[in-house]
Each structure stands twice: as structure tokens, then as C-alpha cells.
Swiss-Prot record:
It comes from Pseudomonas amygdali pv. tabaci. This is Uncharacterized protein in tabA 5'region.
Amino acid sequence: LEQVLEYYLGECLRYVNRGLGLFPDCDGMYLQLSYFVQLGALTLQHGGDQPVKLLVDHGALLAGLRSLARVLADALLAGNPEAAVAFYQFYGPARLQPLQPLVTALGNSPAQSIEYVQEPVRVPTDCDATCAQARL
């Protein structure tokens, strides 16, 4: 379980490293990390010449994931857009303070990402071609 949680955190960091405000998935991952830091599941250790470290309480992180799922469901599905906006403003990238040392460290280091090509799927617009494919 710890390896799965650490893989997940690695993905969060990879997305945040892409650039806040440039990609919605980046901002969403920032929101998640900010939530976990403010919950106490993650701790940023920084100071002096030492690199920023992200310390993980695996049990608290697992509980935090469950909590985040409930909070998001409540905020987004309750039909109250003000609650969803308030949640985003408190945990999202508009409020950098909880993760400022991490964001600064990522901004000062070379971007690390996996390069790949994702070709768009071509969907035929012709009804006959679509119907023929459906019969296969």
C-alpha cells in the first residue's frame, strides 16, 4: 500500500511540476497536495541549503484520500457552487502558502517529464462507415 501511495504522490509532483495555471490537471494535483498538507498527512521539510522534502504519514494519507473524496463529492454534487468555489480557493493554487517551498523548489529545478506522442482518435463522420464498424 505504501508503494501505491508513493507512486500516487510522484504523479502529483510530476503534474505540479508542469506549471500551475497552465494545465487543469496540474492545478487539481496542487489542490490535492495542499489538502493533504493542511490535513497533516504530508509535511514539507525545508530550510537552509537542504532540498525540500515531502514527508508522508501513509495512514493519514489514506484517510486523507477518503476524506478528500467525500469533501469533493459533497462540494460538487450538492448543487451549491459557492461551496465548490470556496473549497477550490482555499486549497487550490490561488493560495500558494501551504506548498510555497515545494513550488519554488520545483520551479528552480529542470522540468522532468516523460515525452510521448498522443495521437487523436479519428472517428468517421460518415454514418455508413460508423454503422459498418459497429457490425464488426
